[in-house]
């Protein structure tokens, strides 16, 4: 005859099964994200649009039931440029399709010193065509930027592509490099997400605080650029007797540059076109601010005097 179980025995079996499920779930959570989950989280960093092919997860270390540290190599693209003294420096990093962020803005937001002495003469090459900047110089500059002592596998140069631009005042180049980045992740309701990052001997930095600090610097930069355009419009009016009449900032810039405005300024630090509405006796200049939407509370406005 089949063995019969009492109600109490069945209850104990059920409780034991549930306990096993809970323990198993906690054990899986304690393992941290898988490599694919970590890669997905890194590609979701809103400040830096990365493809999966640009992320190589090296290791995952669980630091708690819902936290983990991930070591990864990221393929990043930089613009290098020479300064007034002919010294090479890192000027921009690509943060998305046709979108670049100025290194100076990032450094100001993080209160970081990006000065680097990487301009010693390169040794002569044998059997190879020299490129400028050299791989050695590019590695030195990026190592200094990220707090990494070079030579190191934490900075590996994939490509140096000089960019000859006709009539350009300063030589420039595009550099593709793999940079070792430590990422701190948290398992939130929507899945694993990156909350902090660190490179080389730098301290951990929170991504949300970086975004806020960077937006503050961009507001300051936008205000400075709008003031420059406004000053140019006042000069235009003092000579012509009226402001530029237009509803597009690009039209106003075409009238102002180069006689009244030496720099051609068309987009704000958030990569959105500046707004302009001008009549003969008044004008309004506008940046849509961090949200990129006009007529919201974060707009930056400069009007005629």
Task: State where each predicted segment sits.
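Bacterial N-terminal signal peptides that target proteins for export
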Residues: 2-12
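Bacterial N-terminal signal peptides
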Residues: 12-21
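N-terminal trafficking/processing presequences and adjacent post-cleavage segments
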Residues: 24-43, 98-144, 210-241
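Surface-exposed, charged secondary-structure patches
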Residues: 28-29, 40-77, 93-109, 133-180
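Short beta-strand element of the conserved SAM-dependent methyltransferase core
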Residues: 60, 78-81, 185, 276
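Soluble periplasmic/extracytoplasmic beta-strand elements of cell-envelope proteins
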Residues: 71, 79, 89-91, 284-286
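Asp-box/BNR beta-propeller loop motif
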Residues: 84-87, 189-191
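Low-complexity, acidic interaction segments enriched in glycine
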Residues: 93, 149-305
